[in-house]
């Protein structure tokens, strides 16, 4: 019988390479700023050809969008491990505190460019927005188990409000050059506000 424990599919290899390119771009972004990096610089540092870059990303801006894909792979694990057994308000606060910590690790320059009104992935009305989808799921599950939202509130409205608040936290953190602990700030603000949102 063959041992498949070290077997890598083409998709797995492509994902690894895409993450490598993203991480190289992120390092360069932290060193010299997003506006100062070029695709050629990324390729040189990553040890790949420009053709290989374009096989994985359509543009420099597309690298920013990969943040979302990268984060999504961690979301379900966070839900399963960190939120299990918590009350709904605690789940929502813990999830967004995690998002803020994950985002802060990417650096100020990344945040300024990704969390921009020009970035269509940040449109809170997009149906596929994973953060809203996750918080909706948490709220709907809690409601099925007897949690009652305030009159006139829906899971989507709560999720959208939370998402907008967190984007505001990220914007403020970026405007202040990352001078404070974003996750800690989010913990305090969301803990104070969560009751009014539900």
Predicted features, each with a name:
Residues 73-76, 80, 120-146, 153-164, ...:
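Amphipathic alpha-helical packing segments from all-alpha helical-bundle domains
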Residues 100-122, 171-175:
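Amphipathic alpha-helical segments used for helix-helix packing
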Residues 14-25, 42, 67-71, 75, ...:
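Generic hydrophobic, amphipathic alpha-helix propensity
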Residues 1-16:
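N-terminal intrinsically disordered/low-complexity leader segments
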Residues 66, 77-105, 159-162, 183:
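Hydrophobic alpha-helical connector segments
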């Amino acid at each position: 019988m063959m041992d498949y424990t070290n077997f890598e599919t083409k998709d797995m290899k492509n994902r690894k390479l895409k993450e490598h390119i993203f991480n190289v771009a992120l390092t360069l972004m932290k060193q010299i700023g997003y506006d100062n990096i070029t695709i050629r610089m990324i390729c040189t540092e990553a040890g790949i050809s420009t053709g290989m870059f374009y096989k994985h990303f359509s543009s420099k801006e597309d690298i920013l969008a990969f943040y979302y894909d990268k984060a999504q792979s961690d979301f379900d694990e966070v839900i399963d491990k960190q939120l299990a057994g918590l009350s709904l308000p605690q789940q929502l606060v813990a999830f967004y505190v995690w998002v803020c910590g994950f985002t802060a690790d990417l650096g100020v320059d990344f945040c300024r460019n990704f969390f921009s009104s020009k970035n269509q992935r940040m449109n809170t009305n997009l149906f596929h927005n994973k953060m809203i989808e996750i918080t909706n799921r948490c709220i709907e599950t809690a409601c099925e188990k007897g949690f009652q939202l305030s009159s006139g509130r829906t899971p989507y409205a709560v999720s959208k409000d939370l998402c907008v608040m967190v984007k505001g936290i990220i914007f403020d953190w970026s405007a202040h050059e990352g001078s404070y602990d974003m996750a800690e700030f989010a913990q305090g603000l969301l803990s104070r506000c969560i009751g009014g949102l539900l």
